[in-house]
Amino acid sequence: VPKHIPLFSIFALLSLWSVALPAQSQALLPYTLQMDAKELEQQGLSLTQDAVQLARFQQYELAMQRAQLATQLAPKSFQTWFLLGSLYIQTEKLDQGIEALQTARSLAPKEASILFSLGSARFQKGQYSAAVADLQTGLKLKPDVPEALFDLGNAYYKLNQFPQAIAQYQKAVNKDAKFWPAINNIGLVKYETGDVNGAIQYWRNASSLDDKAAEPRLATAVALYAKGDKEQGLALGEAAIKLDSRYADLKFLEENLWGNRLLKETQKFLETPRIKETVANSQGEPAQPEVVPQ
């Protein structure tokens, strides 16, 4: 699965802010209308909700325009900067996103969601130690958020701090037993550290929670094939690739935190005639994106 959860903070937390909106919806007010600071702020906050709705339908450019205007109308409201920063990150403008999120943090230093988003952005930039620091600070303010624990586990994993990574993934699972991406990633760590049987067990557990989850199925297939259980491995691998052919791409797997050991075995697996044929037959078929539990 994608190793960050885009727009989680926007969609999950804007609904909790209970933003007070003007009595009547107004797209753009006449410039001649005199408005006090409070009215301007309300208009800015109203625009943030418009932007969120646009982002839900992946209309990011339109959402960005409204978010930018919202920061001008309500520059002292952390919500507007938080939304703008999150949209920048979603569109891979990471430096601008971090700058906007830092502004949001200066306005609301106790808002954990800002720190979670900063941690995610720093992770995407490869600043793993900084990501750990932001995520840890956020979790002190708001503990037991599965997505944040998952991100923290990923940052530790990239720093090769494997026990810490597993601990954070396990905390995420303890909070949400159906959060299979964390279970899957424990398997990734186990495999890289030589515990093949342990990895397979975690991947099978992850697969049991979502019958559309291609990643843990393919990982299990590769591990079984490498162990010598070739027929079962090939059959499971075929099924996984039919679910989502993106996982037949080594670069995509690396982006999803598959380690060197597993990638090496996967390369061999993908070169087998049966899997090559499955991949070829899957070309052009629309992938069924895995659904991250909310």
Task: Spell out what each predicted region is.
Residues 1-42, 56, 65-69, 279-294:
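Long, contiguous interaction/recruitment modules in multidomain scaffold/adaptor proteins
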Residues 56-66, 90-103, 124-137, 158-171, ...:
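Structural signature of tandem alpha-helical TPR/SEL1-like repeats
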Residues 204, 208, 214, 218-249, ...:
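TPR/TPR-like (Sel1-like) alpha-helical repeat modules
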Residues 26-40, 239-294:
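Terminal, low-structured helical/coil segments at or just beyond the last alpha-helical repeat
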Residues 40-79, 83-93, 120, 124, ...:
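Alpha-helical segment of the N-proximal tetratricopeptide repeat
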Residues 37, 44, 78-79, 112-113, ...:
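Helix-start (N-cap) detector for alpha-helical repeat units in TPR-like alpha-solenoids
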